[in-house]
Amino acid sequence: MHDHEIIHVNEYDRRKFLKISGIAAGLGLVNSIASHEISFAYPVAKLPGFSAFSKSVRVLKSEKYYLVESDGIPSHQMMVGIRSWQQQVPTTQPYSGTNAWSIPITPVISKNPMSAKDHFLRGAIAIAVNGIPIFNALNNRGDDALLAGELDNWGGHCGRADDYHYHIAPTHLQSVVGSKVPIAYALDGFPIYGEKEVDGKKVVNLDSFNGHFDSKKNYHYHATKTYPYINGGFKGTVAEIEGQVDPQSLTKAFRPAGEPLRGAVITGFSRSGQSTFDLTYSVNGLENHVKYSATLKEVSMQFIDSTGNTRSEVYSRK
């Protein structure tokens, strides 16, 4: 389970922006205003890998960062295969405007690289080219999320804010983007490639961060089938504030924290359009459903147990 109530600052002072705009206006309005302003302030940019997802992801370029905008919902299937579930579900997220993901345009090798084994147990450490954040392979308890059965068949699950994210490399994206471009970018700015080099050769001599220099002395990370799966920390310079990379996009829980549901296995997940979903899970062989619709303003949920009993809840997102 993750607590994602985090603050993101690009080249705006977000706290000052919130004060000027009026906190009572709510996150949705603030993001709408910010997105409008930032769209005019910064041009659309090209960054290898992202173009394959141009219908759902936009990349802008500021003075210091590539700014990645998405709604946090991937086009691929989700949730199926999870065996350790906190009863969180994927919902749309406000990753736009001043809340977009920030990738440094010019990454710099750090004099003191930091390992993800004892840093960055909160928040994202990378962003995939489909606009989905990637968290530390270790969850916030320090356990390997994959080995704990917390991840779906695509390497992701949902956090405290019902936000979908990966904890291992989304190597399945290579079937979309190919092997010659990154599948993700670490938040220090260095690219993350798949399990082979761009020329198809075997990856060798990775450092403890899952990266190495190429023949042109350019640094990059690689995905691996074993820990750390993705960048195992940062070879590049980053700022760490309260256990996470800064800047960091903001998500906010809209309902009470889910509890572990012992014996639950997620067996199905379907969607109708962009905002209506049906999650199927079994407990002791009995089928249950969570049917819901989610926008940035409201989430409406129906919990249907194996006997057909239904409980409905509606949450406002502020």
Identify the function of each model-found stretch:
Residues 162-284:
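Domain-length functional cores that host ligand/cofactor binding and catalytic or interaction surfaces
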Residues 274-318:
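N-terminal accessory interaction module
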Residues 96, 147-149, 159, 214, ...:
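Surface-exposed coil/turn segments at beta-strand junctions on protein surfaces, enriched
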Residues 81-85, 145-151, 202-203:
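Short linear interaction motifs
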Residues 89, 149-156, 205-211:
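Short, recurring structural edge motifs at helix starts
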Residues 113-180:
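Extracellular-facing segments of soluble proteins and assemblies that are Gly/Ser/Thr-biased and enriched
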Residues 1-16, 20-31, 38-40:
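N-terminal secretory signal peptides
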Residues 40-141:
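Solvent-exposed N-terminal domain segments of exported/luminal and surface proteins
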